[in-house]
């Protein structure tokens, strides 16, 4: 645990932290001025709730003029040589306010040893609970529910890349909103959020193992102040398809190589 302000944790040669007993690999208190960089987090054979937790749950940090900086952080759920499947509930949870993230790759493995829907289980890639969190180059792939959940206000994302899981076995196990919607959007912004803005998003679909539908790539509350600029969806190959881009707006992608775009979205309107 890191509880002292202005601490720097720098991984030399991409230092790897692996959950051994269902534990969190690294967690911090609500302290400002932290810098974490150059770390790889691996899920373990005993399921953890998280691999990285920034800040205390339910206690957001005060604004003292110092951001927390998280750079070059990578997360693996499977994909390495192992005799036993690995799993985690969520790779990274950010509870603190005033966080800047740069270059996150959050990956549930789609190939390797003991990789399958009921083996390397992981619900979410990253959950943002803090306010004033900014992410640059956020890449989240193949998780079994929402790839990214954003609950904080005044969030900003510059470049987001995401692949929907390849290995969904059937539609019945992949339904959101208490079974009312097909699949889980890649990026989910909670209805309580009043201000959020994102630029340059790409969500990619490859239904490799079953014919299942994804209702929409991104869910946001339809409010003035919640804005999305330049988002595209692409069907890579496999079974179709993805029906919408944001909420119920945007055209579907249903054949290999098809790409659709929304340039500007706010409060239910495409501009």
Residue ranges of predicted features:
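Extracellular/periplasmic carbohydrate-active domains that bind, remodel
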Residues: 1-271
